[in-house]
Amino acid sequence: MSNRKYFGTDGIRGRVGNAPITPDFVLKLGWAAGKVLARHGSRKIIIGKDTRISGYMLESALEAGLAAAGLSASFTGPMPTPAVAYLTRTFRAEAGIVISASHNPFYDNGIKFFSIDGTKLPDDVEEAIEAEMEKEITCVDSAELGKASRIVDAAGRYIEFCKGTFPNELSLNGLKVVVDCANGATYHIAPNVLRELGATVIAIGCEPNGVNINEEVGATDVRALQARVLAEKADLGIALDGDGDRVIMVDHEGNKVDGDQIMYIIAREGLRQGQLRGGAVGTLMSNMGLELALKQLGIPFSRAKVGDRYVLEKLQEKGWRIGAENSGHVILLDKTTTGDGIVAGLQVLAAMVRNHMSLHDLCSGMKMFPQILVNVRYTAGSGDPLENEAVKAVTADVEATLGNRGRVLLRKSGTEPLIRVMVEGEDEAQVTAFAHRIADAVKAV
């Protein structure tokens, strides 16, 4: 990815009004993508967005660029990222485009592409789009210009898809669920899915105004959800992020249930039902408790680099079906092609109903290890702290002390001059002290 000028691991993202998230850039991106995608034959593109106010501006720019290249755009309106992937497949569109910055604040936005099969665009297509970006815009003949239309039943189609991933013989009757939609793209989807499956639903974070997406709500901040679950005496809470590709849950006691625990529940249930193919993929940040719990069940476990893109690559490499990040990206390849918060949440609910167990009890087979993360800022250009001998020595000493009952992970942030120091083990006081000891060594570089 290092030779890319615009595309990162998750499309193109930035602050609105600053390059590259400007109207003129996005118009040209639409044109360049249109030129490349038109070579493949189909001339239909699906465009969805989350609830950021800048989405209106950016979808108009994309539409203009695509039309100039001769491609027609079909708009879904606010729609979760996994819904756009699904609709791209079912409409046999050449590509799907999502305008979203996921869990970021409203003043950020981004552009992400899906291919005709609902997966990420191949690298060679992204590279071809970047090459077109270097050319001057030329407009096709007037008779060949693209058109724009709306998919009026997009939400209904996706709601039915989500419900179809929940076992027909089960229902959510009798369950009280609080769902937090982060004032994002699932606000008109998730509550309806749960209600139509029989649950009593209390919805929060479902009043988007263009600037409140992810603001003290959603998968990145579950405090409001925890409080509401306790106040309503609900059976559980479900928190989605701004574009609906992450899910974090809350049990009836108000305890947070993260992506590692969600994957454990789904993998164990798959094993019980005889439906688990192969093992499970986590990341370098996945809790050691997950690895040990899966090992006890005889389920193979593999770690990918941090990022749902790398989880998906590892799943494809191994031919496995289930992967997750502790941040709540859960990928279930037997159900969908990308991380889907609603679909993952439904599989946990199915396990609860089928086993007559609370979410709290479903998590009890996995003991979470204390995991301490310290971010240390360093001066870019002053040498690599990870190659420093003193840092290496302290890290080796901590690893030797922890043995096979803990882990140390040092990695650079992909976006800032930060070293992330993570120490994990059985004793919280010990791992906290170890994390700060390593962090102090990094600071001294």
Swiss-Prot record:
Co-factor note (free text): Binds 1 Mg(2+) ion per subunit.
Phosphoserine modifications at: S102
Lineage: Bacteria, Pseudomonadati, Pseudomonadota, Gammaproteobacteria, Enterobacterales
Cofactor field: Mg(2+)
Residues at the active site: S102
EC number: 5.4.2.10
Gene3D superfamilies: Alpha-D-Glucose-1,6-Bisphosphate, subunit A, domain 3 (3.40.120.10), Alpha-D-phosphohexomutase, C-terminal domain (3.30.310.50)
EC top class named in words: isomerase
GO CC entries: cytosol
Annotated positions binding Mg(2+): S102, D241, D243, D245
Functional description taken from the UniProt entry: Catalyzes the conversion of glucosamine-6-phosphate to glucosamine-1-phosphate.
Entry's family note: Belongs to the phosphohexose mutase family.
GO BP, sorted A to Z: carbohydrate metabolic process; peptidoglycan biosynthetic process; UDP-N-acetylglucosamine biosynthetic process
PROSITE patterns found in the cross-reference section: PGM_PMM
Modified how: Activated by phosphorylation.
InterPro entries found in the cross-reference section: A-D-PHexomutase_a/b/a-I (IPR005844), A-D-PHexomutase_a/b/a-I/II/III (IPR016055), A-D-PHexomutase_a/b/a-II (IPR005845), A-D-PHexomutase_a/b/a-III (IPR005846), A-D-PHexomutase_C (IPR005843), A-D-PHexomutase_C_sf (IPR036900), A-D-PHexomutase_CS (IPR016066), Alpha-D-phosphohexomutase_SF (IPR005841)
Keyword Coiled coil: no
NCBIfam families per record: glmM, PRK10887.1
Family matches, as HAMAP family: GlmM_B
Catalytic reaction(s) noted: alpha-D-glucosamine 1-phosphate = D-glucosamine 6-phosphate
Protein name, entry field: Phosphoglucosamine mutase
UniProt keyword Secreted, yes or no: no
GO molecular function: magnesium ion binding; phosphoglucosamine mutase activity; phosphomannomutase activity
Entry keyword set: Isomerase, Magnesium, Metal-binding, Phosphoprotein
